[in-house]
Amino acid sequence: MNIWTMTRWKKYIDVDACGHRSGLRMRFDQGVDPEVRRACMEFAKWLRQEYEFPMRVPVYVKAAVRIRAMDGDMVCGTFFRPYSMSVEPYARIATGDYLDLCEERGQDNALAEILLCMAHELTHYFQWLNQLNLTPVGEERQAKRYAH
């Protein structure tokens, strides 16, 4: 069973409710590299064609090298999962190390790493959306597996 195509969320979300918003949205900091922006937009377009996003989820693409998670750790990506299904979640990914990654691994691998981070955080979206009962370790393992 693929959690990205699971429809357990239909029990919890009324997509016909007035004011309900759906879809995957991309938001970019001004300093994000144009090639990163292009790759993320292209990936998002493909994701929209392949998967349903019944609850709007914005992905904030940050120009920072790392972003601070809720626990204080500096990380490449985060996902905010609200307690209520009436509040929209969001993901953030850090892309400020793109040029360094290009030098170390080449452009294709650098972009792949950023897109893998985005897929990882969106897997957390589908875990939240379908209300899967996993341990924190289980959530990370599943997100890592689905992203790769």
Task: Describe every region a protein language model picked out.
Residues 116-129, 143:
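Active-site recognition of the HExxH zinc-binding catalytic motif
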Residues 37-56:
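Zn2+-dependent metallopeptidase catalytic core
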Residues 24-34, 47:
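An acidic/histidine-cluster motif and surrounding catalytic segment
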Residues 136-148:
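Post-HExxH zinc-binding segment in Zn-dependent metallohydrolases
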Residues 129-136:
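Short helix/strand-bridging catalytic loops that position acidic/His residues to coordinate divalent metals
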Residues 2-26:
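N-terminal, Lys/Arg- and Ser/Thr-rich interaction peptides
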Residues 36, 40, 111, 115, ...:
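Hydrophobic (often cysteine-bearing) scaffold residues that line and stabilize catalytic clefts
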Residues 69-111:
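Active-site scaffold of zinc-dependent metalloenzymes
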